[in-house]
Amino acid sequence: MNLLIMGLPGAGKGTQAEFIVKNYGVNHISTGDMFRAAMKNETEMGKLAKSFIDKGELVPDEVTNGIVKERLAQDDIKASGFLLDGYPRTIDQAHALDTMLEELGIKLDAVVNIVVNPNILVDRLSGRYICRNCGATYHKIFNPTKVEGTCDVCGSHDLYQRADDVPETVKNRLDVNIKESAPIIEHYTELGLVKNIEGEQEISQVTDDIKKVLG
């Protein structure tokens, strides 16, 4: 089975990716792992990627695509299939993936897309507060303080949010993700591959729904 998994930050993609890999015995391929392995093994594309990273530059698409193709060409992929996580990030990468899969004779079976309302994700991702005095961490929904505004550990009233946890920052980050992922999802929908999964349910129910669509 050859799969992609998609979903906005905070949608629970990582948890469900772990389940799919364990349940279906496919290889979990994440962009970070691929880059690290390619650089460690000093593959042609790995050396190229390292040359950009060492200069503090963004790795161009053609190098990223090359690293993905190197990984998909390996024997364990032919034997067990894959779950691709974190790629493609742009519509150009999606078209490149189509081409490389065709060249390698690999068929993509499904795109698992975990759907959660962005407003809910803002709440999930922006609810973290930290005690400036002792460093204890809280979440306004999942782990609130017993007394509002007071640290359970040290009793301090000095609770703060990190800049990247502020709702406006989180919303901006999600907006960028939505803008980039929308054409990719549309592309795979046209190919009849997208399986939309309701991600606002309990984790176990999300997992059950994935089992239903993948068989």
Swiss-Prot record:
UniProt cross-references to SUPFAM superfamilies, sorted A to Z: P-loop containing nucleoside triphosphate hydrolases
Residues binding AMP: 31, 36, 57-59, 86-89, 93, 162, 173
SS bond list: none
EC numbers on record: 2.7.4.3
Compartments where located: Cytoplasm
CDD domains in the cross-refs: ADK
Sites where the protein binds Zn(2+): 131, 134, 151, 154
Record remark on domains: Consists of three domains, a large central CORE domain and two small peripheral domains, NMPbind and LID, which undergo movements during catalysis. The LID domain closes over the site of phosphoryl transfer upon ATP binding. Assembling and dissambling the active center during each catalytic cycle provides an effective means to prevent ATP hydrolysis. Some bacteria have evolved a zinc-coordinating structure that stabilizes the LID domain.
Name of the protein: Adenylate kinase
